[in-house]
Amino acid sequence: MPAEKTDCYAKFQAYMGGDPWLNTKELSAPFSAKKPAVIGVQFMGDLFHESITNEQIAAVFGVMAATPQHQYVVLTKRPKRALQWFEWMSAWAKASGIKDYEVRISLAQLDNLIDRRHHVVYPEWPLPNVIICASVENQKAADERMPLLLQIPARWRGVSVEPMLSGINIGPWLLDEDGLDVDGGWPQNHDGLDLAICGAETGPGKRNFKDEWALDLRDQCKIAGVPYFFKKDGSGNGSLCGVEYQEWI
């Protein structure tokens, strides 16, 4: 995992109680980053919030396409909306007479956003530098969001279990439908999850977290050959039982 990480990128903000507006200063920030970085993408916590238009989301993807040196992690609790956006993007591409894997960078050509030195012509699609992660906190959320996430035609898909509020079984989504289940212990190339991120809730009023929950998730990923990244325990420590787990795609 690259050493540099920016947590809040492409912030959309509500202005005077009206419609969200695109913060072009934040959106253009990746162009001025001097070194490749792992960048977290958020819209007030979720890029795929219902109030964000398809065109605004496309502008963010346009910037990600134009900066292939960076890796982007898009966290969402709304995989259904994300899937709808990818379907919209595919339909738009067909209506425009271009192939599904081609991205029209013009969607990101907003005023004062990308200068003439930055341009992309038909980059690879889905973008190889973007990881779409569903955020889940317990088994119920995983059962609801994981099937939708795996329908999204993203190059990389992952799960972010943060804050982890209970033990979670992600075995059904670690391997593809034709692969052996995680209990069989057969790591392979698959169309299931590509990454698992895990972390506890911290700060005042934090809810309960148990090391064994995170260790069990680690074991599930190890059996399936899926990278496991542990962020922090309830005290903010970046290790789990004294061991750091920072595997990455």
Residue ranges and their predicted role:
Residues 38-40, 71-73, 129-133, 156-160, ...:
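Structural preference for beta-strand elements that scaffold enzyme active sites
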Residues 147-151, 171-249:
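Auxiliary Fe-S-binding modules of radical SAM enzymes
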Residues 45, 78-80, 136-138, 163-165, ...:
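Active-site-proximal loop/turn and secondary-structure-junction residues that shape catalytic pockets
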Residues 1-129, 139, 168-178, 190-193:
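Conserved Radical SAM active-site core
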Residues 57, 142, 214:
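Aromatic/hydrophobic pocket-lining residues that form the small-molecule binding cavity
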Residues 29-31, 42-43, 134, 200, ...:
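Pocket-edge structural micro-motifs
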Residues 117-122, 144-148, 183:
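Short secondary-structure capping micro-motifs at structural edges
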Residues 136-138, 142, 150-177, 200:
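Histidine/lysine/aspartate-rich catalytic loop segments that bind and position anionic ligands
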